[in-house]
Amino acid sequence: MNFIQFNHAPCIIYDFGNNSFLLFSNLRCSITSELDTCTNNRSLKIVKLNNVNSFENCVSLKYADLRRWNTENITDLSSCFSFCQSLKKLRIENWNTSNVEDLSHLFSTCSSLRSLNLSRWNVSKVQTMDYCFSGCTELRRLNISNWNPCSLISMRQCFSKCKSLRELTLNWTTSHLRNMSNCFAYSNFETLNLQNWRMNNAIDFSYCFFECKNLQTLFTPDSHVRKLESCFNGCESLIALNLSNWNVDHVHKFNNCFKGCKSLAILDIRSWNINSRAHTNGMFNGCDKLDIVFCTEDTFYKIVEQFPNSDEWVWENNEARKLDEE
């Protein structure tokens, strides 16, 4: 296909079938120079486009205006723009995504992209968002405020390495969600409010907020948790954390859960029932400012050895407190 001709093509109906992942992917070197922009603004009705890796690895693509594409039949957008490292502007805000089930790796490593408005997308059938925005290191504005991913099951590393995003509105219904491992890892969010999320299933929170060094405020929903390894490891700006609405009855590994939370002073885990066989190694390593932990007596005696200066702690009336230095 001549891509210059494609950019100026009249109204066309395309049936790309199940081989659509070959559409533009991996265009490099001299060929890619023909695809530094893609601006087909004429009516392009795609009657069958089920597996869309279309622009994956188009490393020279800088601008794409695909607003006129008819995407109503698409079920899979995985890796569509992944590794488009030069992409700075993308116009797909009006795409019909009502049948899409897979958004994994959609914008993964779009490291030049600065703004995305996807608020009009219907994501009600989406089941996986693994790595969706991972590696979008320059992304400063992301509007997904109207999303309601009510079928979502997994969002592993969804926002990992989003180093330029400071805030994000996520008023979601997530009653089927099971996996949030590394979801916000290595990002620079200052505030995250997940309080309205519904989490009816046991969630994998391992490494979820790993190395979120700027995270100061976190609101979490009622949750049944199954994995907590290194969940808050490296959250060095958190001062207070309320996790009293988490059920951890089935968690077996708490290793390094709060490691490196060097500003954390108050922790509320009063509802936690930690299994006597659970691994808690390194749970509070580096939490040198921790003074108060709201917890049951049973929990206190299971984790007190992991507290900094553990011999200086006492428990009374559902509160573990570090003794004042004389």
Where do the language-model regions lie?
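Consensus positions within tandem repeat domains that build extended binding/scaffold surfaces
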Residues: N19-F21, V52-S54, N73-C80, N99-F107, ...
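Structural signature of tandem-repeat unit edges
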Residues: N2-G17, L27-N50, S60-N73, S86-N99, ...
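Universal eukaryotic N-terminal targeting presequences
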Residues: M1-F3, E325-E326
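A short acidic (Asp/Glu
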Residues: R277-G282, V304-F307
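Acidic, Ser/Thr
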Residues: F24-S25, K259
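C-terminal capping region of solenoid repeat domains
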Residues: V304-E326
